[in-house]
Amino acid sequence: MDRATIEPAIKLLLNEIHTRLTEATRIAKAAEACALAGSSAEGVSVSMDIEQLIYEADRLQGAAALLNRLSGG
């Protein structure tokens, strides 16, 4: 596949990974704040949203890696 065609797609995928992991970081900080304030159960509840974001970031990473391999990178 043509690298010039794939490059913008890879950049978009990496941006989406960054977006999801930034959101996961925000949620993790909120969960930690709950735990530090004495509410570990609430912290765990808040942190449950992280799982989906990490799953999505992993799938996006797989797609970016595949495109990179297909382009000979």
What are the residue ranges of the model-derived segments?
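N-terminal acidic leader/helix
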Residues: 1-34, 66
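Short, charge-rich amphipathic interface segments used for partner binding and complex assembly
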Residues: 30-70
